[in-house]
Structure formats: C-alpha cells, structure tokens
C-alpha cells in the first residue's frame, strides 16, 4: 500500500537523521524553499472541518513564561484589532461575501465551511475595549461605530481612524479618549465589491500617513468567472489618504488577507492565501515582502514559476515575471493575521512576526488553527515557525476557536481575535 510505503520511508529517515519523521516531513512545507509535490486534481477536493465546541473553563495554550486571558466576550465575529495610542483596543466585527455558486462543489464547500463558523449574526461594527487602570482587566466594552458593511482592516494615523469595509475605505475623525464615533464616516475610496468571492479588505498605513495599503482578494479560485471579474483584484492597492486616488501597488496576490509595515525599514509585508484544488499539500499559503510593481503569480503560476495548467489562456511572460514569496506557511492554513513583534514580547519573540492561522477546511488532516511566530534575522524570516498560541482544537478533533487578527500591544501583550468563540484573547509575559 502507498501509505505503508510512505510510513516506512519516513521511519527510516527518522532513524538516519535522529529526528522525528513527522516533524521532519512537516518542516519541508515551511520556509523559503518548501517541498512542492506534484499537483493532484479530482472531482472534489478533500473537505473536512472540525465541529465547534465551547471553550468552557479551558484556555488557549501559550509558551512557558506567558499567560492568556479573555478580555472581551460575546462579540459578533471579531476579525482584526487595532491598539490606539492611549491603549484602547478597537475590534472590527462582521462577515461579508455574497458570491454566487458556480458549480455543485461550491455548494458542498460552503456547507462544509459553515460547520466551522459561528452562528452569530454579523456585527457590522467596531467595538472599543478599555483598561483604564492598566491592570489587564478591560472593564469597558462598548460600540464605537455601527451600521458598517463587514468591516475588516483597521488603521490609525494622527487623529484619523480608517476602516476597510467590504465595499469602501472610510475614515472617522478621532480624538484621544473618545469611546464612540462623533459623526458618520467619510468615504476615502470605493473598493471592489461586486461578487466578492474573497470579501476581506486588509489594511495598513505608511509610517508618514500619506498612503494606505489595501489587500483585495480575487473573485474566484483560479479565474472561473473570467478575467473581467478580476479587474482591480488579487492585488494590493496603494491609496492616497488625502485624495483617495489609488493605483495597483503589487499584483498576482490571490488573497492578501493581512498587511503590516516592518518597523525601521518601512517595508510592506503580507500574508496571502493561495489557490485550492491542487491537493492537500499545494499550494502553500505564504508570508512575503511586497515589492512595488511586483507580480506574484496568480493565476498563471504559484510559488514562483510553477505553472498552473488549469488557467486559460496561459501567459508565459507572466509566469517568467512571477516573484517567489519569502516564506511558505504550509498549504491551506488560512493565514488571516499579521503583525511585527517588538521587545515587549521578550527576547525570544522580539524579532519576527506573529501570524494568525484560521485553519483549513479542505484537508483530511486539519492544519492551522493556531497563532505562530516566524523569527526574523537581519530583517528577513529565519528558521522554523514557533507555535505561540495553540489549543484551539481539542484532542478529539473539535474546534474551540479560530484565530484571525493578531496585534502587538506596546504595553506588552499580543491581542488575538477569535471569530468562532467571539472572544478577544490577550497574551502577556508572566509577571
């Protein structure tokens, strides 16, 4: 049997190398040079998602020397978070997307995915959390702005609070300490929202506040709706904060779900969810620096210049121009959160990025469902990822939570949004 042969090979490799075969095999799918298997295509992809179960009195698992607490509960699908200059935390809550199904397999996939999501209605709001005395207990949980349209990305600069709805980038005037918006938002720029196969709009802002960067996902897996449906999609927009004028900053990014600016260098980075239906171990979701004018492959190629022969017509010139991402995260982990760390997280976790992995729906053995730390050295990813927040899945295969946004709080914490349990977690170094 193929499985027996594979297990024998792994066992022999473990004996020869002195490390566990399972760990060695997993490590091959991470980093700058992942092992890519041959594509596997079938009538239906593998589909499996864990049944939700409450946290009860349990908590996520964090590394030794850290502790975790829930600082907000009973939310309505928390996605991304933002720490304001005064320490207040904003939480974007909502669920978007309304793409019609093209094939029966799309209907089946939606049913499978729905089993792993909350039954709570979309909040379509931004909630504010406040810990006034700095004791780690957030005694105030109040709605800052409501009647939004599936808000996702959040950014702040010099009294301007930006929210990326699924259809528009908007701005609120903000004064230090206010607990609710004083007026309706001003639209900065309209964002693509027709069909909205991938609806999330990731957001970050340049250090000088001049430009906003918005991640806009594709309208399909691999152009099943035609290239016209992909106009202005599968890319990062650069938007002038004052005028709202935009331009494509980088293209060929199937679904850039979180963006962050690297401290010091000002370099834009992203996590990207790659295409489906090429097998359980293709294609790796990834972390990458985003180069202005760069093309990252979608839909014609993946992980550099590996051709996706499902796409018609082919474009060899585009394939040749495809940039290889910096760091593979593993296939189908569904990375949705990204933030750079700092010294407040301790020496071991001071240099690198935290990534929230929402978890797979299209593998027999689920992956993701955790927050990882990717260490950096000299400004680049270096080494294997480290599990930082786990325990979202139970030993019997059920799911307590699904991490989305991750934000480093300068006061010394990692903030994690959990959109299944409708909780915001706070991870701190033990005192």
Task: Tell what function each PLM region has.
Residues 81, 154, 203, 256-259, ...:
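Hydrophobic core register within WD40 beta-propeller blades
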Residues 137-160, 165-206:
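Asp-box/WD-like beta-propeller blade repeats and closely related beta-sheet repeat scaffolds
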Residues 21-62, 98-102, 108-109, 115-116, ...:
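Beta-propeller domain segments
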Residues 84-87, 156-158, 205-209, 262-265, ...:
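Residue-level detector of Asp-centered blade-edge/turn motifs that repeat once per structural unit
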